[in-house]
Amino acid sequence: MISANDPKALCDSINAARDAGTKVVTFDSDTDPSCRDLFINQATAEGIAQVQVDMIADQIGDSGEVAILSAAANATNQNAWIDMMKETLAADHPDIELVDVVYGDDDDQKSFDATAALLADHPNLKGIISPTTVGIAAAARYLSTSDAKGKVALTGLGTPNQMRDYVEDGTVTEFALWNPGDLGYLAAFAAKALVDGDITGEEGDTFTAGDLGDFEVGADATVLLGDPFKFNADNIGDFNF
């Protein structure tokens, strides 16, 4: 089981393993579909993009300049989400202007510095979307001690444990994520189903993933975990991951 930061870079190694009889399951961030047997998708690109756009629109009054702080420029999942966010903003939020997309390479300090640069380069910035757990935490850390705290909204994808302090101190109002434990749990059951021969990765194959219930393989040998979940001051204390 692997999560890929580049859709092509691992394909030669993966295909060598598959030729030797190894079943390959990707999760979180996919390779090219031809390089693996199954992809466990935490949510659809459309769903992840939509929830982040909805949150930032709500937090900035559906008007003003926003920017995106992403991970690596070639990260498969990030780019899919960003493309969908651009489409959703253009179609449904004409008064929101996406002024920049920057990359922190999932490095805390680089993401922290990129946040500072965004605020310096765009003095009228009203919001930042960071669809990466490293990026959103670094951006929150910067905003929490800056004059922009409470003035520039921050949302995206994060974990409750890393974001709890920033929600409680008012730096962040709301963010989203799937349950990573459930994602790994589903990936493990899917891999076992492949190895046992219960499924082949064909569209329409079904299997049971323990306490999560039954799942069906969709197009491009993809299995969908579900919809993203929003975390805020009302519920963040209920989670510990």
Regions inferred by a protein language model and the residue ranges of each:
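Flexible loop/hinge segments that line or gate small-molecule binding clefts
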Residues: L10-G47, E65, P160-E168, V172-T173
